[in-house]
Amino acid sequence: MDLQQDVDLLRNIPLFRNIDSAKLKLLAFTSERLTFQPEENLFLQGDFGDAAYIIVEGDAAVLIITPDGDELQVAAVRQNDWVGEIAILCDVPRTATVRAKTKLVTLKISKDIFFQLITQFPQMSVEVMRELAS
């Protein structure tokens, strides 16, 4: 995939929908493309949240550990969804485990890069506040 395709993908995420293309290009350029195999975890519930992931292709399960210690699937995510945003936006441990159900291609957006962009581009801060309020 080229940079413009990554920008188009980011534009499909509500948080980034109203951000101009130049800022999205910078975000896409600084993101890391990662591939996960079926049953591979992107991250585990309780982990430190250092990044969010945008699903480029594939499907994943969002799982929580119940009080009995069992895994419970609470959501499914697919192309154009993003996961891990709560941990980077709210500075809390991961609230769930995300596990690939199929081969999964993601864009990993690091917390540091994300907040550098928010600092440099105030419009992104406004969009983050809108996302948190919804």
Task: Describe the role of every protein-language-model region.
Residues 11-63, 68:
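Regulatory nucleotide-sensing modules
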Residues 19, 55, 78, 101, ...:
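A conserved hydrophobic position in a structured secondary element of the catalytic/binding core
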Residues 74, 87, 97-99, 105-111:
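Short hydrophobic beta-strand segments that form the core of ligand-binding sensory/regulatory domains
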Residues 6, 22-24, 93-95, 111-134:
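A small-molecule sensor/coupling module
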Residues 32, 82, 91-97, 103-106:
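Helix-loop-beta junctions that constitute the ligand-sensing/allosteric loops
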Residues 67-83:
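Short acidic-glycine-tyrosine-enriched beta hairpin
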Residues 62-63, 85-86, 96-100, 116-117:
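Short beta-strand His + acidic residue motifs that chelate non-heme Fe in jelly-roll/DSBH
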